[in-house]
């Protein structure tokens, strides 16, 4: 049946009698049947889970937090997760294979957005569960547009109320849950904070309920199906987006030109491609300061990914 983080609709009024503060929010959720209780499943489960939502609700941060490794580019700029990226979370009782999709866009302003919207639909076509992520502050018009897409194509949908750490009065979440269940028959509604790591185990528990009994698809040590080269390119692009902010259009792309890896280290040469000559000084910065910082931050993350010393060169080039 339909559940609000573990409770049926007729039981939810009982929770409204509790007066909550930030400190006893966890206690409220424990009373609702979530807590830290873990059920040991006899049969191993495995399946695909899509993550959808409008831009900037924390989809990539959520996957990174659950998987425990950085698998999806995160940025304050929307539309930076351009391709389907799988993140694999493996436990003793289940393996969840996450399909991270771009945020559903309300207007097709470019071929890029059209491609991204097609990617959303493709991702929903062959998954066992869907995480629909919205901001715990409440529903927005773009959330409603995503919901229309789910009405047509989704199977088992869990509503994730993210960023609960930013909601001072946690009691406000209860009417939001009731409102949400009126909009769509969600399999469960789970409030979380991906940034702070709150309620993630409970979310994983709800996902596992929707997965079929199956042996794991991937080796336990794997956390993404993307190659190190792909993740390195995404890492460089992420640093560029973070450091350049609103200065750079979305045409920026990264290509790995050379990749020489040994047991002791890796030498990587990458190109940051921009659409216009006038974009080059924006990326390079005064006396090369921005490009050096992009390279420095990316090199540190790539070295951590590979577990070895990394020499990284990044060049800025213009598409001709």
Language-model regions, residue ranges each:
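Active-site glycine-centered loops adjacent to acidic/histidine catalytic or metal-binding residues
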Residues: 100, 162, 193
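Conserved, well-folded catalytic cores of nucleic-acid-processing
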Residues: 69, 88, 92, 104, ...
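Conserved C-terminal guanine-recognition region of P-loop GTPase G domains, centered on the G4
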Residues: 118-187
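Conserved glycine(s) of the Walker
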Residues: 58, 199, 290
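P-loop NTP-binding site
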Residues: 228-320
